[in-house]
Structures are given as C-alpha cells and as structure tokens.
Amino acid sequence: MVATFVTFCPYRPRTLVRDKADTMKPAFGTLRFCEDAADLAHKGAAFLCEYAASRPGRTIVALSGGNTPKPLYELLAEEPAKSAMPWDQVQWSLGDERFVPPSDPASNYGMARTAFLDDVPVPVENVHPVKTDGVTLEEAARDYEAMLKGLYGSDTLEADKPLLNITLLGLGEDGHTASLLPHEPVLQVDDRWVAPVPKGRVEERITLTYPAINASEIVAFLVSGGGKREVLDKILSGDDSFPASHIRARGDVLWFADRAAAGRWA
C-alpha cells in the first residue's frame, strides 16, 4: 500500500539544500515547498500516510484546526490515502480545541469528523476528542492531559520517548500556533501538558503546551496564503519573537508552505 501511495505524492527525507522535492533548510526547521493549497494538502496527506504505514507499531497524531488542514483531512478519506492509512494503528488527538460542543462549527474535532473521521475505518477508541460537555475549562484540560498520560504510559516525559509522533500545526498572522497566543500566560506554562486558555482576546480554549508539543517526534506546520508570508519569513530566518518560533521537536520541524506563504523562499 505504501508503494501505491508514494506514486500519488512522494515524501522525501530532509536535505541540507533544495532538491527535486523542493525541500530546503532555512534557519529554523525544514521547508517543504508546495505550489498552492491543493499541493500542500496532497503532500501533507502523503507524508502522513507514508509515515504511519512505514511504522511497525502505533502512530499518535495531533490534529490542527483551522481552514488550512481541512483539504488535507478530506484527502485522507479518499483513495488512495484511505487504503494506504493503517487506521487501526493510528491514534488521533488534538493540538488545541475551542471550549464548545463537537456540533459547534468552531469545534476542531467537529471539523475533523466532517472532513475525514466519519468516513474512514478508524476504531472509535483511536479518536480522542476534548470533553467539553458538563465540565469546566480547567477540568477539560486536566482530563485531556490524563488521557495523553494514559496513551504515553507515564506521567513524566522521557527524553528518548516522544509523546506524539506527528503534531500538525497551523500558523497565525500574529505568529501564534495551536492556542499558544502572543503575550498570554499559557506561553509560560512548563509543568503541564495541556492548559486552559481563558476567554480574553479569543474564546475559551484548551491547548497543548510547549512541553507537550516539543516532545513530538515530528512537528509539521501547514502554512498557506499571502497573509502568512511576513511572519513565516521572519520565523524561517530565525526571529524568535513569536510563539511559533519556540516550537521544537525530538526529530524535525517541517514547514509545508505554499508559494503564496513561502514568498522569497519559493
């Protein structure tokens, strides 16, 4: 199944210079250049499928919300991705969530369900939404952290054991990622894996914290559109003044960026 999917859109390992797969190394992470939003979705879906299918055991993926990943998710519910993905071996979690019911249009889990989870043969126990009904924001964050600790098998992060295999992230025009928002107290949280984000500039949310995200084997940013060009350029150049600038990974940080977002890097 892997070989079949590779013909759809191959993922090639990182390299120090740009190659035929349009991979290059800026100051921060590895850039995977994509022609447009559709190409980004295809390359992202191919990467997820090839990665999961190549592993002997389970793969834990943290999904991103927003508009950019939705076409990628929709491809996962179509052939050849639908047959290539080892659904019974993949656990699907969330990088952040708005404190709303799954039926709310703003729900990241609700979007993922509509885009692909309801249309693929994934075991129900492999899908991990945030419980938002009948709990407080703090309880929702603690419950989700407890779920992650159960998956991980420990209450303490270990240097040689990633918490998540792949974490998908978006990038805001203000440099935020997940719900790690500029100037918010959540940026300073270093003793929790999941934290609440009280209502302020945005609605109530919960988010993975830096310690949790940075314990990922691979972090893959999905960045599309000219509105992200300036902030992406600064981050790729090494500017550390944005929340997304402080994302790390046990392996690599990948940037899947389309031509509009990549700008001079394209």
Regions from the PLM with identified roles:
Residues 22-61, 138:
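N-terminal glycine-/serine-/threonine-rich phosphate-binding loop
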Residues 24-28, 85-167:
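Ligand-binding beta-strand-loop-alpha-helix segment within the catalytic cores
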Residues 53-80:
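Glycine-rich N-terminal segment of FAD-binding domains in flavoprotein oxidoreductases
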Residues 63-68, 169-173, 224:
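Glycine-rich beta-strand-to-loop/alpha-helix junction loops that act as flexible
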Residues 74-85, 110, 114, 182-190:
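A glycine- and small-aliphatic-rich helix-loop capping segment at beta-alpha/alpha-beta transitions
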Residues 166-211:
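Class I SAM-dependent methyltransferase SAM-binding "motif I" and its flanking Rossmann-like core
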Residues 217-266:
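ATP/nucleoside-binding phosphotransfer catalytic cores, i.e., glycine-rich phosphate-binding loops
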